[in-house]
Every structure is written in C-alpha cells, then in structure tokens.
Regions:
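NAD(P)H-binding glycine-rich loop region in Rossmannoid oxidoreductase-like domains
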Residues: 47-89, 100
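SDR active-site strand-loop-helix element
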Residues: 6, 30, 67-71, 108-113, ...
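NAD(P)-dependent short-chain dehydrogenase/reductase
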Residues: 148-196, 202-203
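N-terminal Rossmann NAD(P)H-binding glycine-rich loop of SDR-like oxidoreductase domains
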Residues: 1-23
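Catalytic helix-loop patch of NAD(P)-dependent Rossmann-fold dehydrogenases
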Residues: 88, 92-96, 116-158, 162-165
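Glycine-rich Rossmann NAD(P)(H)-binding loop
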Residues: 190-195, 221-228, 277
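N-terminal Rossmann-fold cofactor-binding loop
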Residues: 29-38, 48-49, 71-72
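Mid/C-terminal beta-alpha module of Rossmann-like enzyme folds, strongest
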Residues: 207, 214-260, 265-266, 299-316
Length: 316
C-alpha cells in the first residue's frame, strides 16, 4: 500500500511517516517548506499545498492508496495574525485534498483539533455540538464540514488534543519550546487552570495507520491520552523528567491572559467509540514523558543547566 502524508516535516506528520515505514508500507512524504529524511529510501518532497494544479498532478502521477492530511497552520496566534493565509491551508487545502483523494479512490484521513469546542462542558464526545471560540477553531471546524461533505465513505476525520513528541527540527512540541525558552534565560508562566488531555504523537500515528487499514471506520472520531492535566503541571512534569528544577516555571492563571475569552479553559475527550475499535491503547502522561528527547543542539546546554542530567539517557 502506498500512503501519502501531507505536513511531513511537522510534529505529527513526521511521526505518521515513521509509523508508515515501520508498518512496511510505501511512503510518499510531502512538506510545504523543510525537506526531511526518514531513511535512506524515504525523504520528504516539497509540495506547495496552495498550488491546485501541482497538487493534482502529483497525486495523479503517484496515485496513492491513502492520504493523511497533517498539514495545518496550527498556532492560534499565527492564524489570528494571518487568517486569510491560514484559511488557504487549513480549509481550502483540506477540501482540495479530500476531493482529489475521492477522485482517485484513496482513503483520506484528515486531522482536526479539540479547539473546535469552547471548553465549557468537557469531556466531549465526537457527537457533541462544536462551538469554537477563536479563528483557528473556526477554520478547523469549517475544514471538517468541507471534508465530510465530499463523501461519507473511505474517509475519517480525527480530532486530536495537545501533542507530546519529538519534532524533526526540535522546535515544535511542548517540551522543546520549554527547553528553548529556558536556554534563552526566560522563566515560563504556565496556567494551572487551563486543562488539557495530552496525546503522544507516536501513539496517535499508530491510530492513524490503523484507520488507514480499517476502511470500515469512517466518519468523525476523537483521540487523546488517558489523563487530564493542567498546562502548568505538565510543564512541571516535563522538567522533572529531565532533572531540571521545576521552579523555572511560574504558576499563572488563564484569567489573566489578554483575550482569554477566546481560549478554551478545559478541553478533554471521550475516546469511544474509536478506543474500542482499534488495537492501539491511549497512553498515560508518564508513558508519554518517557518518549521525550532533548534536541541534539540543546544537549550540551542541558548537561550544564540540569540539576540531575544523568536521569536522561540520549537516544541519538
């Protein structure tokens, strides 16, 4: 089976590429900017998602059996600053990919977000009514509707939560951002009243490949880890995992954030019915933390900065 992954240079997209290779499938990896090497055989190819003709030509030439859309402008701040540009990727690009996939008979997996909800009645089922507070959530909800309107067969939309993992460039995930802030001499303020249900990208990518393998699983689903935690406590747990003094993180409140009304305070998921239909089991936060690695370019700094650097064994 030949599987195309869009957004291959991102945190989730790169994990999906690794999972595809691990399962023994043929990989077509595409990224908008950076080129990433996954093995001697597989490398990502630059493909502008806004170029309809080039996108169509590439997929008609390659004719993949499945397409996974991890491509998105996912920073709410970036979306707010450039909503029209974000719309081209988050909505128009997703709709275009769904249509092309349907035309060539490829199974289509589209990744969405917990930010389609307002956070007032967590935990959410996949059948609950969305009510996004910000532009990013509104765009992802629109992308869901566009994608699901293409066909009700051979297609799945998967909403996901806050992601833990190791990105190719070492700059995308929660722990990477925290470590880079500390390296620059900053102390971070994280909110103890902003609750999320983090998910491992490695675990999530296994679920995505299972969805590809299960053409009977169509429609809208939720996936996450199996525990809720505040952003503040997650930051503390990340520092403890790497033997760094947790006092480097300051406790704050989301209520003190400017425009906090546009940011959901409590987002968590009910994972059924998907959890009972796939072999992959959602991970605890402790299990997710064990997967995290220090980016290579930060390792020398980390050895000097951490109180107990020997608690971490590098895998590069």
């Amino acid at each position: 089976m030949k599987i195309a992954v869009l957004g291959a240079s991102g945190l989730l997209g790169s994990a999906v590429c690794r999972s595809v290779i691990h399962r023994g499938y043929s990989l077509l990896a595409y990224s908008n900017r950076e080129t990433i090497s996954f093995s001697d055989q597989y490398h990502s190819k630059q493909l502008p998602f806004s170029d309809d003709n080039q996108l169509t030509r590439e997929f008609f030439d390659q004719w993949p059996d499945a397409v996974v859309n991890c491509a998105a402008i996912s920073s709410p701040d970036t979306v707010d600053q450039s909503p029209e540009l974000a719309h081209l990727v988050n909505v128009e690009g997703a709709s275009r990919l769904a249509s092309i996939s349907a035309h060539i008979g490829a199974r289509f997996i589209h990744i969405s977000t917990d930010m389609v909800f307002d956070g007032s009645t967590s935990p959410y089922r996949s059948t609950d009514m969305p009510n996004p507070l910000g532009e990013y959530g509104r765009q992802k909800l629109e992308s869901e509707k566009r994608v699901l309107s293409v066909t009700d067969e051979n297609l799945a939309v998967l909403r996901v939560t806050l992601l833990n993992g190791n990105s190719p460039l070492g700059i995308r995930s929660q722990h990477e951002k925290i470590l880079r802030a500390l390296m620059s001499g900053k102390k971070l303020t994280l909110f103890d009243d902003e609750i999320r249900q983090p998910c491992s990208v490695e675990n999530l990518s296994d679920v995505i490949v299972e969805l590809i393998e299960r053409p009977n699983l169509n429609g809208l689903f939720h996936w996450a880890g199996n525990e809720e935690i505040s952003r503040y406590e997650l930051g503390i747990q990340i520092l403890k995992r790497f033997g760094i003094n947790p006092e480097n993180i300051i406790r704050g409140s989301i209520k003190n954030l400017e425009n906090h009304g546009q940011r959901p305070q409590h987002l968590s998921f009910i994972l059924e019915p998907l959890a009972s239909k796939v072999r992959t089991v959602p991970l605890s936060i402790e299990e997710q933390l064990k997967e995290l690695q220090i980016p290579k370019d930060l390792y020398s700094w980390y050895r000097k900065f951490a109180d107990s650097p020997n608690c971490y064994i590098p895998r590069f």
